[in-house]
Every structure is written in C-alpha cells, then in structure tokens.
Amino acid sequence: MKLLLQRLNVTNVSSTSVKVSAFSKSITIPYLEKHMELKQLFKASAIATALVLAGCGGDINISEGDIDNSVTNNNGGNTGGDTGGDTGSDDTAPGEVSSFLSGEVSDAFGQSVEVRVLSGRLTADDADDQGVITLTNDTVWALEGPVFIGNDKADSVTLAIEEGTVIFGRTGADYLVVSRDSKIEAEGTASSPIIMTSFNDVVGDEVGAGQWGGVVILGNGTSTKCPQDGSDCALQVEGAEEGAVFGGTDDTDSSGILKYVVVKYAGFEIAPDNELNGITFGGVGSGTEVDYVQVHSNADDGVEFFGGAVNAKHLVLTANQDDSVDWDNGYKGKLQYVYVQHAADNSDANRGIEGDGDGGDGLEFSKPMLANMTVIGNTFDTADADSEGLLLRDQTGANLMNFLITGPEEIGRAHV
C-alpha cells in the first residue's frame, strides 16, 4: 500500500545553510558540517512525515519526491472488513479483521481498506511452516494492547513486515515487543518505507506525541546490571508489562532488521523513569541491522539503548520531547550518520544525547562510538528540562567524532 503525503519541506539547500519547514513551521539551520550535508529532502511516506533517507558516501541525503496521495490496493479483492459481500480477507493472516476500524480508515482514504487487529502474543501457532508471521502491505495493521512476538526464549518466531506496510496504535497501551530469540524483519525501501504511527495520523485527525506506545526489541546482549560471571540474566525493560525481559552474554546476538522504518507520535509514561520510547533496544546485539530509521515526535526518548552492542546508521530523530539518543546499562554499539532536530516550534525538547552507565559494580562502563552526528536545538527551557546538546553522566565513556551541536543562543551545549 503506497500512501505518500509530503509534510516536510527542505529549501535553500547548501552545505552551510538549509531551511527546514515542518508542518508549516520553519527553522533555519545556520551550520551543517560537510559530513552531514543535506542535499535533498526526504520523500515523505504513507500517511505522514515518513522521512526516507538516501545515504551515500557518508552523507545523509534528503530527497524530494513526487506527491502521491493515492492508495494502491494490492489485494485484488474487496477489502472492507465486515461490510458485506466478499471481503477478500485472507483467513490465514494474523489478527482479526475489525469492521469498525476498516470503516474508519476506509472513510479517511476514500476507498475500501482492510484493518486487521493484532493483540496478545504471536507465536508459532500464528506462523507459517518456516516460523514466519507476515504483515502484508495490502492491509493496515492495528496494535491492541501489548503485542508480543514470541515468548521469552521460547515459541520463537520472525515477524516479517513488507515494504510500505502501515501499522498503528490508538493509545499509549498499544505497543510492539519483540522477545528474546524472536526476530523482526522490517525492511522497507527508500520509496516505500514501513510506517508505525498513531490512529489519528492514519485517519487525518490532530497528531501529537504520545498517541500510542512504541516499539521494544529485546535481546541477549550484555548489561552492567546483569551478573558479571555470565550467569542467567533477565532484566525487566522500561515501559512494558512484566515479562518483557532482556540481557545475557551474547553481544553478537541478532534480533533481525529495521531498515527504512519510521516511528511517529509514540511514547507513553507509565510512571516517572518508566516510559516507552519511540524504539527501545534492550540488550540487542550487533547481529541486528538498524539503518535508515526515523523517530518523529515521541513523548519520551527517540531511541534508547539498554546495554547490548547493536549498531545503527542513518538515524533521523526529530521533534522528540525527551532525549533523542539515550544509552545506559553498558551500551557498547556504534552510531553513525545521526541527525537530531528539536521541534521547530520551540516546544518540548531535552538532550540530543543523554548517556549513562546506570548501575553495576562500577567496573563496567557504557562505551559507545559515535561518528558524523549533528544536533540542532531550540529555545525550549523550563525548570525541569531544556534543549541541550549532550550530557554524559555516571559510568559512561564515549568516542565522538565529527560531532556538531548548533542552534539558537539559548541551547545548552555539552555537559560531562
């Protein structure tokens, strides 16, 4: 399903100056290092600001494409849920068709669209003979409550998401969890990314941070909070219900792939210091591929790494209300080509990076490596939070190369 709606425009592009206009709000970026040269504009995708990165030779390239507001129905049948007649539904597909949601989304798009609801735990009983559960792009998928992929180190399956697929949640309690030993294979393309967003975004209502939960990926990587003797470890991850655990001894573990994926309008605070991020990586290993990913307008952190050693490239983190990049628990991965921009309207923002070691015996530190990163702040400043570039706290080190912090005079720069 290809639904393209452009909502972010870049004009006046050069290596030193670029004007970004988001939702009719503009911010002028006065400085851009050559490594972060913005040449073109992302082609926005499926239902809203799906910023599609086309990186080449170390640049983050943002390319402007044609606007296509059409819906391509690849089903070949009449997809409308329980609207009478032949629905064209695949009875072997995961989840249940919702006639209500199908009707709401169909009305918004002006043509028949099938919405299937995913809930509970998806295991081998829901998979094909190869242990794969596939979300196709001829259906829109809704999350209802926590949706777990596999059990922890049991009933392991792979969730395969086709390019151009749209997934949404309706409340902060709707989120996706990939359990240890299960995988997510979410591989979009530059012209047809995978979109995970809110119901409001899908139907064209008012959008904002915190309209659904987010994505949680759990792996078998190391953590400073795990026993350092290599014995069993199962740490409860922030934001998710009990049983969503991570940790182990394998920093090369693979949880699958996220490529050309956009997560928007997510984040949810269960309690202080217990929140869902746009994407949470708990003990995720370096065998996982993360490339060309955007998190936009999240109510908490854009991405957070709890231990592990997963690497990520071509990250775009825009208008997130807390830290854009957060790490702790001994995270040791590599991040390259990272672009952070706080909200253009100077609304809620915090740090471009917040790094911690967070616990353990004091001997193990977080030690990530970052190269080619730009942070553009805004003027947000309150007693509790303000727009800052970098904060490194207890038990963390970091190697930073080609790192730029810029923005208005009010922005906090760096604190170590």
Language model segments and positions:
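Beta-strand/loop edge motif enriched in small/polar residues
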Residues: G57-R413
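Bacterial Sec-dependent N-terminal signal peptides
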Residues: K2-I47
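Secretory-pathway extracellular proteins and peptide precursors enriched for disulfide-bonded cysteines
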Residues: I47-A48, C226
